[in-house]
Design a protein with these regions (language model features):
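Bilobed "Venus flytrap"/periplasmic-binding protein-like clamshell domains
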Residues: 49, 53-56, 65-80, 136-195, ...
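A ligand-binding cleft/hinge motif common to bilobed small-molecule-binding domains
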Residues: 96, 112-122, 171-175, 203-241
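Ligand-binding clefts/hinges and TM-proximal coupling segments of bilobed small-molecule sensing domains
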Residues: 28-31, 43, 85-88, 164-188, ...
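Extended ligand-binding regions for polar small-molecule ligands
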Residues: 72-82, 141-144, 151, 159, ...
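Extracytoplasmic small-molecule ligand-binding "clamshell" domains
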Residues: 33-113
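Short helix-initiation/N-cap motifs at beta->coil->alpha
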Residues: 88-99, 148, 185-200, 204
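Acidic, polar ligand-binding/catalytic clefts
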Residues: 88-154, 238
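Periplasmic-binding protein-like
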Residues: 53, 131-138, 224-261, 283-297
């Protein structure tokens, strides 16, 4: 059962959406959050951190117009541990973040980014992931007693909404099928479609399950602003696992990436990471990560 801290999440949702609208309209933002005083600027290397402005609870702009979210909070801990740098947090769009980190406009980017071979060629992936994104199955409420995981879904011969091959979910189902050759889920590749369409297909009976990101399910079904909120009693959801997300570093910032890994290990050992997980997710999300998270995602 999902236990996100909705009091905090809903409080910032409206602000996050407004910020996202502004980003779409102007292609960027004017606000830059700095972690120390301008007087020190000349003596320190500036580290520019780009982040999405509307991805609650990972990275967003909060009600106080400050950069916030789990991934941002981890990088603010990094900033505190590396006083030789001056960190600037810059909310922006997906495209600007990816292009900017690759080109050197930004040093680091966080957006709930999964590991892919294509991205590995463009960015430095540190040893340690920064967060994780939960994926699971959305299905009809009437099947709640029958579907408890992918294995039980496969035994029912359920029809899964097609998945784009480049999506992480596709690779996860492929891995499940390799591990369960006698009880596979029929995996059909698809072209991209609007996420909210899949929920309608489930209710229509066209498909029996939608293997999707938990936040998509929450935003479409459980939030009052969701398209299917009024039909929420007709849906059920079970978690499968969490896919690691990474901070993306510019190719020239290997030293900074190495320092990130050292600080991450200290944060884990001290319990600070778990503290932040409970604050932003309401539970230990890393427990749902299987393996090291590497491989094609």
């Amino acid at each position: 059962m999902m236990k996100y801290n909705w009091k905090n999440v809903l409080a910032v949702a409206a602000v996050s959406l407004l910020t996202a609208g502004l980003l779409a309209g102007c292609g960027g933002v004017k606000k830059v959050e700095k972690t120390d005083k301008p007087a020190d600027a000349g003596a320190k290397k500036v580290v520019k951190v780009a982040h999405r402005a509307d991805s609650v609870p990972y990275c967003f702009i909060n009600k106080d117009n400050q950069s916030d979210g789990f991934e941002v909070a981890v990088l603010k801990e990094l900033a505190a541990a590396l006083p030789q740098y001056k960190f600037e947090f810059i909310p922006t769009s997906d495209d600007d973040l990816l292009i900017g980190v690759e080109s050197g406009k930004y040093d680091i980017g966080v957006k709930g980014a999964w590991y892919t071979k294509a991205r590995k060629d463009k960015f430095i992936f540190p040893k340690h992931y920064i967060a994780a994104s939960v994926i699971g199955i959305t299905f009809r409420k009437e099947d709640e007693g029958k579907i408890k995981d992918l294995e039980s879904f496969a035994k029912l011969k359920g029809k899964l909404v097609p998945i784009a091959p480049q999506n992480a979910q596709y690779a996860v189902v492929q891995q499940y099928n390799r591990e369960h050759p006698d009880n596979q889920v029929k995996l059909v590749p698809s072209e991209n479609f609007k996420v909210d369409e899949a929920y309608g297909w489930i209710l229509e009976g066209r498909y029996d399950g939608y293997f999707n990101i938990e936040l998509n399910h929450i935003n479409n079904v459980e939030k009052e602003t969701g398209k299917y909120y009024k039909l929420r009693d007709k849906f059920a959801y079970v978690r499968h696992q969490a896919i690691p997300t990474y901070a993306l570093f510019n190719k020239k910032d290997q030293q900074l990436a190495d320092e990130y890994d050292k600080v991450w290990e200290k944060l884990q050992k001290s319990g600070k990471l778990l503290e932040l997980e409970n604050k932003y997710f309401g539970f230990d999300i890393f427990k749902l990560v299987k393996g090291d998270g590497k491989g094609e995602r």
